[in-house]
Amino acid sequence: MHRTYPLPSTLKQNVTAYTAKSGSKTYHGTYPTKYRTAAVHPKTCGKPSSGTKLKYGTQIYTVNELYLPGFANGYKDDFLVEDMGDVNCSKGFSPYWFDIYFGVKGSSTDKNAKTFGLKKNVSYETY
């Protein structure tokens, strides 16, 4: 696949991690996939009906691999937009922030998500 340099909107963004209850579906109606599904802001803050800022199915490729606690391979650089998060854009994240699904809520997955924490200055490309 041919990759180009990231657009300015995807430079120096925030990345976080989340877990969800068993059986939870994403904003787009799919079941999230551990360490693959990404949630993004809505197009219009406070209006989930506006859709996701990055369209459903957008592939996110981080310029540098991210260390994902609990992930078998340790590092990963590709994620898929399937969910919406921070609907009111009230958490102070960058405009093109994304949130990586770390699995079903539980002591180990919650711990891994918390350990991942908030990553700043993450640049990525989308396809």
Per-segment meaning from a language model:
Residues 1-127:
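Solvent-exposed, well-ordered loop and adjacent helix/strand elements within mature globular domains
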